[in-house]
């Protein structure tokens, strides 16, 4: 199994994942010029994606955490997470935040993020002060 993580464009994320993202309650807009994405390829198949958006010089929002069902439990999300965090830390933010589904919330809590609020839809807003 050959795994590769690299930056990808929004149009690729939208084309490959929009339907799956929405069915998993992960928000994605058709046009988004503000989010940076990283994709995970296994044997040249795009199987997972994570993103982030710079809210301000000191605040970065983590977004669009998704791995296709058949590739879960293969360290895809862990590798994407680490790749994204390493890139984000180069920007020297003071705060990271995210809106989490039930699927992504455990990883955020394990990484030190604290729950700020829970929406009526079950989406949890978390923050981490660096």
Where are these regions (language model features)?
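Short amphipathic alpha-helix that is part of the acyltransferase structural core
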Residues: 1-32
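A conserved beta-strand-loop-helix scaffold within acyl/acetyltransferase catalytic domains
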Residues: 24-37, 41-42, 46-68
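Active-site beta-strand termini and strand-to-loop segments that position acidic
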Residues: 41-43, 127-130
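Acidic/histidine-enriched, beta-strand-rich ligand/metal-binding domains
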Residues: 63-64, 72, 106-110
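Conserved acetyl-CoA-binding loop-helix of GNAT-fold acetyltransferases
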Residues: 73-86
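Conserved GNAT acetyl-CoA-binding A-motif
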Residues: 88-100
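Conserved active-site alpha-helix within GNAT-family acetyltransferase domains
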Residues: 101-121
């Amino acid at each position: 199994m050959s795994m590769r993580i690299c930056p990808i464009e929004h149009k690729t994320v939208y084309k490959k994942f929009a339907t799956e993202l929405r069915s998993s309650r992960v928000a994605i807009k058709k046009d988004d010029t503000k989010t940076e994405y990283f994709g995970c390829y296994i044997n040249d198949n795009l199987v997972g994606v994570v993103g982030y958006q710079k809210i301000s010089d000191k605040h970065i929002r983590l977004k669009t955490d998704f791995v296709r069902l058949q590739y879960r439990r293969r360290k895809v999300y862990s590798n994407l997470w680490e790749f994204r965090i390493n890139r984000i830390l180069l920007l020297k933010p003071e705060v990271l935040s995210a809106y989490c589904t039930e699927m992504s919330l455990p990883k955020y809590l394990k990484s030190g993020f604290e729950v700020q609020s829970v929406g009526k839809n079950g989406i949890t807003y978390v923050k981490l002060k660096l």
